[in-house]
Amino acid sequence: MTLVLGSPLYMAPELINREPYTEKVDVWSLGVITYQLLSGKTPFESRNLKKIDYNIKRKKITFENTEQEYWNDISQDAKDFILKCLDRNQNTRPSISELFKMPWITNYMNKQNTLALPKLEREEMN
């Protein structure tokens, strides 16, 4: 794929560099969205488009020694999930199916109890 569309804050580096890309650009965007949902900010925030591009290509994502105290309450599994999604190398960035095997997802899924829903009777329509 080579067509580039989207919001700059969520674009993977390969899109910005106008390189061929795969569905892993969506994994990158998922990482940005997850970061934003957990912190209230995007990881590459700026009011300047060139600075956004620079941040996406080069800014190191860190959760330690920051003024953002909200990361203190976020699990290491969640942080690892974000870092894997935001791998700048699309060849080593995980696929969606690989993400489903990560501890942040599997630990959550294992803790969930499924509800025993009653079977619904099907009414005949006249």
Label the model's feature ranges.
Residues 1-11:
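Conserved activation segment of eukaryotic-like protein kinases, specifically the C-terminal portion
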Residues 18-22:
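Activation segment
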Residues 26:
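Conserved catalytic-loop aspartate of Hanks-type protein kinases
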Residues 39-42:
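Structural helix C-cap motif within protein kinase domains
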Residues 58-71:
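Short proline-rich PxxP-based motifs
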Residues 73-85:
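Conserved C-terminal C-lobe helix
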Residues 88-92, 97-112:
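Terminal C-lobe "cap" of eukaryotic-type protein kinase domains
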